[in-house]
Amino acid sequence: MTERRQRLALEVASIGSGRFEILAITAGAANGWEFPAGVLRESLGLWDGVNCFVDHSLKARSVRDIAGVLRKPTWDESSQGVRAELCAFGPSAEVLKDIGRQVLEESDEAAVKVGFSADVLFQGKAGKVEKILRIYSVDLVYNPARGGIFLRALNQLGINPIFE
């Protein structure tokens, strides 16, 4: 068994001023690795408190790039993935909120390629993930690997998230 670090795409919907509901990761193949639903479900506790940065970085992270934090991770049976609330905060919070609003307004445009990507450490072998060890970050990026996108804006409707 080997340990691997990987960045994976996410999906998101706004649920209030500065808050977004995101689909952090779903079961399936990404970057040559298969992520089984059971492994993702077991990783739920690792997602709470994970920071969101603007852009991935190969260097040490800067506090200037903090855009938010993940809260309330739950298992979403219908999408076979981890769902969580992303709360905007930090020096780059306005970037997150502004881009989210703009992408949601232009959601029908094929040219919009901004979304989220998870930077994770896992154990696996033969192309199959066996255990997620750590979530380093969930980052706002251009052209995420699995096409993570903003889904819809609920904050304009005053809808609060429902976690079943």
Where are the predicted features?
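Short, flexible beta-strand-to-coil junctions
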Residues: 25-29, 55-59, 119-126
